[in-house]
C-alpha cells in the first residue's frame, strides 16, 4: 500500500497521464482507484479473483499458487470480486500467465507466476456465471475504452463441460507445466469450442 503515495506524486506531476495499477491485490488499491480521477485505472488477474494467501501458504505450501504480487487475505479478495462484479469501468482484466516448468515451481527456490493462459477464458466465464455482457465489458470493453481504443470484434464461444485441462495436451518444454484451474480437482467448467 506504500506505493499509493508514489502514485499520488506521479499524478500530481503528470495530471493528464493515463495511469494503470497492474494486477492489484488489496482492498486499499480498490478504494484508491474508485476515488481517483478518470485517468487512473487498475487491472485484476483471474487468479487474484480466486486465491487468498491461505491458498498459497495455508496448511501446506502450494507452489503453483505462488505469484507476485502475492495473493492477500479474504477481505482483499472480496474487495476485488465486488468491484469487478459491480461493473466499475476502471477495473479491467489484466492477463498474466507464467508457464514455469513444474521443476522450477516445486523446489526450494521456486519461481513466482501462475500459468493461466489456457484457463483464463473459462475462469472469467465461471466468475460471471456465463453473463456474456459482463464478461465482454471486463475482458474487452473497459480496458479499450480507458486507452481510447476500439474493443476487439473477435470473439470466442465457450460451452459448459466437466473435462479436465490436465487430460488435454499440455505445454511441454523440458517437463509439464501445471495449468491453473482455480480448484483442487483440476477441472474447468467451461471450454472454448470456437475461436474467431
What is each PLM-predicted segment?
Residues 1, 95-107, 167-175:
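Amphipathic, soluble alpha/beta structural segments
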Residues 86-151:
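His/Asp/Glu-enriched, well-ordered alpha-helical/loop segment
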Residues 54-55, 105-106, 164:
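Short secondary-structure transition/capping segments
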Residues 39, 60-62, 100, 155, ...:
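Solvent-exposed, non-transmembrane amphipathic alpha-helical segments
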Residues 26, 47, 98-100, 163:
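Short, glycine-/Ser/Thr-/acidic-enriched flexible segments
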Residues 1-93:
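Histidine/acidic residue-rich metal-binding segments in metalloenzymes
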